[in-house]
């Protein structure tokens, strides 16, 4: 029992001794830092005459600076002039420099003189490029006039006339980028080739080219693309009576309704004329059989789909039958105009509306079924 207090006393004394020694060491370190004096030794150094160490003046030692900024700059030698002279200093040889500078100025003045002609030539070439479509339209109109006059004068010019008319419409279509207006003229151009096969008499063969010469005029006279496909057909109607010949007027109507034997298919081998007859004959499937699978455009497919859905196609097909029986050519022209307008309106409006109506009906049925199921639950 007595050993415990003794052990505690010994520990306390040792701690106090160590703490006191630590305080003394800290005091010595602080004294050295503040006064910068080493502790006094037991013996003193011998006294030398002269200034003490702290009284001697500080002598700087010269050291080499390795940086470029510390190196002294050499004076510029006349043989090797500086690469980048100061701009403020005038040149040493003004005569030579002036003679050298002047050619550069002349060269700079000559450069724009060379560039100006190039700009002028560019400006002159641009109007030529812009005038090309106008020239093309004027040439196409001239060709149309020439074809109409040549057809009216001679009968044996029948073969070149349809070619000219078929070549003429594409030029105005290029100038007027309107798909509906371009789809309408081929219907009018389709009329001439079939009657040429049905009417084998020479006067009648001279007549169809007149009808072919008439249709190309509407695309030239109707440059407005926004108008629907019907207006160009209405404008195409007046040129047919302007011919005022009985044969051509009778030839304008039959192409829509005549289920002609395979002879017209042999005569109508042109792609434009072959693709158009199925467009005009919407209801009867016989003309489509007569045409021997030409590279028809997607337009005929639209026309075949339209008459099936719309009931208005039946009266249009019945009207031309009466026109065939009637001998008066004037009635045939009127009926042909009406049928053309109806057939063109159908493909533009019917297919899209039918698809939309079917889709809406399907959605309504689904909604009704869902509502019924919810109510039953």
From Swiss-Prot:
Keywords carried by this UniProt record: Asthma, Glycoprotein, Repeat, Secreted, Signal
Tell me a GO biological process for this protein.
Answer: killing of cells of another organism
Q: Where is the composition biased (Polar residues)?
A: 309-329
GO cellular component terms listed in the entry, alphabetical order: extracellular exosome; Golgi lumen; plasma membrane
* Ranges of compositional bias, category Pro residues: 73-89, 169-183, 215-229, 284-298
Q: Carbohydrate attachment sites?
A: 97, 128, 135, 146, 176, 182-183, 188-189
What disease does the Swiss-Prot or TrEMBL record associate with this chain?
Asthma: The most common chronic disease affecting children and young adults. It is a complex genetic disorder with a heterogeneous phenotype, largely attributed to the interactions among many genes and between these genes and the environment. It is characterized by recurrent attacks of paroxysmal dyspnea, with wheezing due to spasmodic contraction of the bronchi.
Q: What is this protein called?
A: Mucin-7
Name its species: Homo sapiens (Human)
């Amino acid at each position: 029992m007595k050993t415990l207090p003794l052990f505690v006393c010994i520990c306390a004394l040792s701690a106090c001794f160590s703490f006191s020694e630590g305080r003394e060491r800290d005091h010595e370190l602080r004294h050295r830092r503040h006064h910068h004096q080493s502790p006094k030794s037991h013996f003193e150094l011998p006294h030398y005459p002269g200034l003490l160490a702290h009284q001697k003046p500080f002598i700087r030692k010269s050291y080499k600076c390795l940086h470029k900024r510390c190196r002294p700059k050499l004076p510029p030698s006349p043989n090797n002039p500086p690469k980048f002279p100061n701009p403020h200093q005038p040149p040493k040889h003004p005569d030579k420099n002036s003679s050298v500078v002047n050619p550069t100025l002349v060269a700079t003045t000559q450069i724009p003189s060379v560039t100006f002609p190039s700009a002028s030539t560019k400006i002159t070439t641009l109007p030529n490029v812009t005038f090309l479509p106008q020239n093309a339209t004027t040439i196409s109109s001239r060709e149309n006039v020439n074809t109409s006059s040549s057809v009216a004068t001679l009968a044996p010019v029948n073969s070149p006339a349809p070619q000219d008319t078929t070549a003429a419409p594409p030029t105005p279509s290029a100038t007027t980028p309107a798909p509906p207006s371009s789809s309408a003229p081929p219907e009018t151009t389709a009329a001439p080739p079939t009657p040429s096969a049905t009417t084998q008499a020479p006067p009648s063969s001279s007549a169809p080219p007149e009808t072919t010469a008439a249709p190309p005029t509407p695309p030239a006279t109707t440059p407005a693309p926004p108008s629907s496909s019907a207006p160009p057909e209405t404008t195409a109607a007046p040129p047919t009576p302007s011919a005022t010949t009985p044969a051509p007027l009778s030839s304008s109507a039959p192409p829509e309704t005549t289920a002609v034997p395979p002879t017209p298919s042999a005569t109508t081998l042109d792609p434009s004329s072959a693709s158009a007859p199925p467009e005009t004959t919407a209801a009867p499937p016989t003309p489509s059989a007569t045409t021997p699978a030409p590279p028809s455009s997607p337009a005929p497919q639209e026309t075949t789909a339209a008459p099936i859905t719309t009931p208005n196609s039946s009266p249009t097909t019945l009207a031309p039958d009466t026109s065939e029986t009637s001998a008066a050519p004037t009635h045939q022209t009127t009926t042909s105009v009406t049928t053309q307008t109806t057939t063109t309106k159908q493909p533009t409006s019917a297919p899209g509306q039918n698809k939309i109506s079917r889709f809406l009906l399907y959605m309504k049925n689904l909604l009704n079924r869902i509502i019924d199921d919810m109510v039953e639950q």
